[in-house]
Amino acid sequence: HSFIQMSKLPNVKGRISYITSHARQENLYATYRTADNAFWNNLARESRQEFQRSGAEGKCIEARELIIALPEVYTQYEPQQVLEDFTDEFRRRYGVECVSALHHNKRKTNYHIHLIFSERKLLPEPDVKIATRSVFFDETGKRVRTKKEITGEDGQIRKGCTIIKKGEVYESHLFTVKDDRFKREPFLREVKEDYTNLINLHIENPEQHLKVFDKNSVYLPTKKIGKNNPKAEEIAADNATRQEWNRTADMALVSGIEEAKILEIKQTEIHDKVSQSIKSE
């Protein structure tokens, strides 16, 4: 099956530096950008400013990243062309800027693309807000109504608080708001199907074509073991158990047992028991 996963990026500039650095990546074959560093610097700054103004808890998400595993047959193709084809496909479909890199892991067993994308687009013109009266911001960057709310007991403005005077710019936007579709399940499902089809276009043997994993099938998915994963042995053992179930399911199908019956056993013997185990902890 194809392997495509998505993650949130609280530090997009740091992540871009990491995936595109030959000094930090042992097997880096190609990099590609659809926008320059200024775009990503501005995106990160505006995302943090908006997050501060919102007063929301947790981490500020500046961008998102896809990891797309490629079959080893792809090592035969020109790396830069592969990377640009996959990145341009995303930009064509969703109209957002991207940075990407094509890697092998240290043992050269996992050929994959990192594709970072923005959830926002540049506005045609910056949206600049001018203060019609004095505007006050507290230490967290949150706007407050009165000067009194940022004044200390000594009558002075508290450290870290700011005042924007009438006629000055108090807020500016270079970007649109985030596109909500990128955090919804249908988007990731669509991306998986789209990239699986793109991968298969360059695999001549139909028997080697990849499929998007169907969670409603008789099979169990295996998990990717990342670099320096402290749970590597545990995941490997779990994968072995899952592969044993998948072989058993294959044999059952070949021997003529109906798929519905296998799904019933999968539900009662695996999903239900795991659910009960979690609830009893």
Predicted regions and their residues:
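N-terminal nicking endonuclease/strand-transfer module with a His-rich metal-binding environment
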Residues: H1-E281
